[in-house]
């Protein structure tokens, strides 16, 4: 979530509603004015609450800038303090506007509940927000274009990922498909969760349909999911080719699979990272961990190919990461 940009859009949209008729050029100028001084346009509990949340998230990220310099015990203690401060910020945001959906979402995620308890909490948040009936595609046919609908999309994304983590693969797929239907642009990444769920369900037809929909937009989730799916179906020659494609798509993809690295909580949604970069590979492997755990020989099979092992080891040497 780009909180600062969304705060600008929220404030500008509410101010346009008060002004009445405003041309596109006029709205663009209004957005520039809001960006110069957002605080001057925060004129309701709704916007004040969102601004408080954005500040809390910014503080959480700034406080973790030097985490790499800490030893394990220091890191755990510092991270616990940061999460507690973030939770306090969410509580403050909710005291300003109890309807701030993003604050409720972040509060649940920051509690680091297990997948079952987290899903219960997220579904409770959704229920309190009025359920899916309130989600509108708007005039453009994409809910993402309405900045006030984005919190609901982020909530659905978190529900889908939590379902995947908790081995509720059909529910993860259903919610992900709902996300893609509500927002075809899919900024939240429902297609990514769907790819992994389809792989675990061994739904080759559904996976191929998703692949066709994303034609020309390859990503690490899709390529890793394809490799797992074909491996589970026992087509080993095709699985080997898919593994090679996965390894060649993203920088450090082999290392990410063979030596999984720590991934911080998504607060509140999956961070945007450069396509084809190492972070994309680490995110995909992290989200696929519950599926990979169900296929215990998959990683050792991948590691058995000298070219794949060498790619991972080479990336380790280039970056200085542990091997």
Describe the role of every protein-language-model region.
Residues 1-86, 92-95, 243, 308-323:
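Extreme N-terminal leader/anchor segments
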Residues 39-45, 90-98, 124-149, 180-182:
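Flexible helix-coil transition and linker loops at the boundaries of alpha-helical arrays
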Residues 48, 86, 93-103, 169, ...:
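Residue-level recognition of tetratricopeptide repeat
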Residues 59, 107-111, 163, 198, ...:
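Residue at a conserved register position within TPR or TPR-like alpha-solenoid repeats
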Residues 122-132, 177-184, 212-220, 230-255:
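TPR/TPR-like (Sel1-like) alpha-helical repeat modules
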Residues 228-323:
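Long, ordered, amphipathic alpha-helical scaffolds
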């Amino acid at each position: 979530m780009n909180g600062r940009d969304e705060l600008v859009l929220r404030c500008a949209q509410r101010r346009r509603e008060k002004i009445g008729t405003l041309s596109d050029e006029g709205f663009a100028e209004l957005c520039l004015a809001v960006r110069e001084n957002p605080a001057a346009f925060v004129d309701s509990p709704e916007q004040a609450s969102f601004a408080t949340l954005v500040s809390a998230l910014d503080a959480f990220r700034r406080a973790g800038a030097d985490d790499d310099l800490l030893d394990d015990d220091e890191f755990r203690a510092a991270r616990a303090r940061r999460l507690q401060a973030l939770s306090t910020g969410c509580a403050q945001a909710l005291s300003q506007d109890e309807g701030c959906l993003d604050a409720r979402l972040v509060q649940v995620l920051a509690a680091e509940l297990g997948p079952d308890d987290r899903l219960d909490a997220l579904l409770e948040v959704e229920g309190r927000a009025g359920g899916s009936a309130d989600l509108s595609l708007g005039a453009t046919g994409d809910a993402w274009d309405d900045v006030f609908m984005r919190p609901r999309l982020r909530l659905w994304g978190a529900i889908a990922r939590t379902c995947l983590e908790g081995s509720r693969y059909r529910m993860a797929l259903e919610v992900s498909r709902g996300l893609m239907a509500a927002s075809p642009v899919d900024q939240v990444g429902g297609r990514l969760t769907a790819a992994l769920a389809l792989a675990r369900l061994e739904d080759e037809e559904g996976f191929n349909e998703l692949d066709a929909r994303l034609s020309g937009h390859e990503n690490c989730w899709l390529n890793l999911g394809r490799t797992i799916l074909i491996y589970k179906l026992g087509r080993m020659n095709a699985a080997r080719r898919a593994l090679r494609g996965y390894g060649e798509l993203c920088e450090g993809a082999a290392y990410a699979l063979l030596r999984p690295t720590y991934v911080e909580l998504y607060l509140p949604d999956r961070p945007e990272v450069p396509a084809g970069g190492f972070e994309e590979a680490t995110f995909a492997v992290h989200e696929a961990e519950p599926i990979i755990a169900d296929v215990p020989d998959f990683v050792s099979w991948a590691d058995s190919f000298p070219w794949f092992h060498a790619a991972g080891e080479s990336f380790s040497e280039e970056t200085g990461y542990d091997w």
